[in-house]
Amino acid sequence: KIPNSAISLSGSKVTGTLPVGSGGTGITSGFINGGITFGAATDIGGTNSTTFTGIPSTHKMIRVVWFGLTPGNQYPEWRLGDSSSFVMTGYFNHMSYTTHNSTTYVDYANNVNSFRMPGWTNVNNTWYGYQDFHRHLHTNGNTYYHQETSLWNSGFTTYGAFFIKGFVNVGTKVIDRYTVIGASGANITAGNFQVGYI
């Protein structure tokens, strides 16, 4: 080990204080001093849509935890938005999953009005997992959110994990909310959701 007394920055071009948590990069990790901040878990059963607000404008990532989401005879969809409206265009959605015999299925939707799981409308579908939305401030002036969702369906255990990936261009909106919806307009049967952010 090199003793601290042997290290000197004098004569270097480095100025100022290097925070330990940033590893000298000047970029502070969101996981320092607490990590993800979660709101209270919410029962979303008995209504068609539930909106979660209070995501700060400074967030870098949004995480949503699904526990026992049973949409009924409809598939779930979800959107991001701000206080004026939800984003209703420009979602690029790619869903894939594998069966017990290693058959892989893929569904891709280009420029639709939500992230979604089309075709999964059986009343026994019950979803567990999480999704992350990574915020990307593009050089073209728009903000994009890259989605990574990983789910398991306890109603159909012969399937492996379900992955839903994609992105949405939210333009200049400052996203502060997330909503989950039953696609047919019927009430969601059951589910417990929790939303957090870094």
Which residues make up each language-model segment?
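Register-specific beta-strand positions within repetitive beta-rich fiber domains
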Residues: K1-N33
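Surface-exposed molecular-recognition determinants
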Residues: G24, T28, N33-I198
